[in-house]
Amino acid sequence: MARVTVEDCVDKISNRFDLVLMAAQRARQISGGAELTIDRDRDKNPVVALREIAEQTVTPEELHEAVVSTLQRVRVDDDDAPDEIGSLAASAEALRLTAAAPPRNQNIGGDYE
């Protein structure tokens, strides 16, 4: 296959910056052992990723979700239930009590005679 350029892929993913992020994500997936959707033809992983995008063997939506999930620092679990109002009020009260300033020492200046 001829050299793959950004122009071959830009009609699939219009934003060049998104294209770079998604191609890099796909190249990392390939490096991690993901199955190729096209023949490698002695190309390196970034070129294979661009060829897959150009030939539409991977969808931009899948790549976008993969990019977003890798950039998230905190992953939301389905098991996590939202806190109840009572526990929120108790948490706020506990925070108020722990954040209160300690009582000031009334003996200013030390123990001098």
Curated annotation (Swiss-Prot):
It catalyses: RNA(n) + a ribonucleoside 5'-triphosphate = RNA(n+1) + diphosphate. GO terms for biological process: DNA-templated transcription. Pfam families: RNA_pol_Rpb6. Keywords: DNA-directed RNA polymerase, Nucleotidyltransferase, Transcription, Transferase. GO terms for molecular function: DNA binding; DNA-directed RNA polymerase activity. GO terms for cellular component: DNA-directed RNA polymerase complex. Coiled coil: none annotated. SMART domains: RNA_pol_Rpb6 (SM01409). It comes from the Bacteria. Its EC number is 2.7.7.6. It is an enzyme of class 2 (transferase). The keyword Transcription applies. The RNAP catalytic core consists of 2 alpha, 1 beta, 1 beta' and 1 omega subunit. When a sigma factor is associated with the core the holoenzyme is formed, which can initiate transcription. Promotes RNA polymerase assembly. Latches the N- and C-terminal regions of the beta' subunit thereby facilitating its interaction with the beta and alpha subunits. This is DNA-directed RNA polymerase subunit omega. It comes from Rhizorhabdus wittichii (strain DSM 6014 / CCUG 31198 / JCM 15750 / NBRC 105917 / EY 4224 / RW1). The lineage of its organism: Bacteria, Pseudomonadati, Pseudomonadota, Alphaproteobacteria, Sphingomonadales.
